[in-house]
Swiss-Prot record:
CDD domains: KOW_NusG. Residues 18-49 form the KOW domain. InterPro entries: KOW, NusG-like, Rib_uL2_dom2, Transcrpt_antiterm_NusG, Transcrpt_antiterm_NusG_bac_CS, Translation_prot_SH3-like_sf. GO terms for biological process: DNA-templated transcription termination; regulation of DNA-templated transcription elongation; transcription antitermination. This is Transcription termination/antitermination protein NusG. It comes from Liberibacter asiaticus.
Amino acid sequence: NQVEAAVQRPVSSVFFEVGERVCVSDGPFASFNGIVKNVDEEKSRVHVEVVIFGRVTPVELAYNQVEKIV
């Protein structure tokens, strides 16, 4: 049931915006900085471009794997 699924899905209090600079805090790309290219609020995921070995690499991460850079 979609209503039950929506109730069980944790809601993040952190909101990301396209173009925002973030730091990856968890996973294989931890400590890399990147730029948010897309936000999927339904799945609580962000698409971030990070520079790895001099190349821009798109990665998809959960909200809890990135932190805003202030």
